[in-house]
């Protein structure tokens, strides 16, 4: 399984397009976004991915309107950090702020 990880896209639509093209070209199986999408339009761009997208909200996402609606519309699994998933019998922690790791462990 190939996993793509991205963070802090901060509404940079040009870079998001580049990221999506790269992940699609490399046949990535899953993309994990570790926060700071910052805008519903940015998150909607990720609908062009040819794989599943999961992630957590970052510190700049909490007050943005529309992120939850876009995540629901495209079946993206976005949650408040910390979060974890089990892939290939491995637990993977997903969080935005590095100081949260002590609470997670």
Where are the regions that the model predicts?
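Beta-strand-turn-beta hairpins that frame and shape the catalytic cleft
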Residues: 1-4, 84-92
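N-terminal active-site segment of His-dependent metallophosphoesterases
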Residues: 1-49, 62-64, 68-76, 80-81
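Histidine-centered divalent metal-coordination motifs
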Residues: 10, 94-96
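Short amphipathic alpha-helix with an adjacent loop that forms part of the alpha/beta core around
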Residues: 20-24, 85-86, 103-105
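Short internal beta-strands
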Residues: 32, 54-58
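Conserved beta-sheet core of the metallophosphoesterase superfamily
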Residues: 54, 97-105
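Active-site alpha/beta core segments
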Residues: 60-61, 97
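Acidic/Gly/His-enriched mid-domain segments of enzyme catalytic cores or analogous surface patches
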Residues: 79, 83, 87, 99
């Amino acid at each position: 399984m190939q996993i793509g990880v991205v963070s802090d896209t901060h509404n940079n639509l040009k870079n998001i397009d580049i990221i999506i093209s790269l992940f699609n070209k490399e046949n990535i199986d899953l993309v994990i976004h570790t926060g700071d999408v910052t805008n519903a339009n940015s998150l909607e761009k990720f609908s062009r991915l040819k794989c599943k997208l999961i992630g957590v909200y970052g510190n700049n996402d909490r007050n943005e309107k529309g992120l939850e609606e876009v995540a629901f519309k495209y079946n993206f699994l976005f949650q408040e950090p910390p979060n974890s998933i089990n892939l290939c019998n491995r637990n993977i922690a997903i969080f935005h702020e590095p100081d949260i790791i002590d609470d997670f462990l």
